[in-house]
């Protein structure tokens, strides 16, 4: 941080918008990602005791991670939070937009991590959800309708509580055995 702010300069708030804007592109992306994760974690944590959340969950040998695993009335969901600094949309089952790198595949990565974590924990995820800031998505939400990642959702952060209450698809239903799932996940989960 000192490389672009200046040596010997006191930094009161490292998330000050002026400092963030002056940072190199890669650092700006990491800061935006961290802020998006924090905002989503705070939102889910405020939903009440009907929800259990695990943050920064390690998958496999630790090469993959899921930002948030949420168990609630609508089932077990894998969430990742992102802020690409521009509007994004769903195209051919993947997130695309000016801020999304060509080799970046958020839905495919999250779905892969959720399937792998599900096998490790002996549970099944109801959906994979990519959460973006409200101004980062033109539609309230978009859902992958077909293909390998069918059911995955790209959603505005403000609508996440509604999704967590109602679920993504009537066919999936909630977890009637949520205490069993919670116990299984809690006993086997590993954190980054």
Predicted features and spans:
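Surface-exposed interaction regions that form or flank ligand-binding interfaces
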Residues: 1-63, 90-91, 95-192
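Short, mixed charged/polar active-site loops
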Residues: 63-65, 76
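Active-site beta-strand-loop-beta-strand hairpin of nuclease catalytic cores
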Residues: 71-91
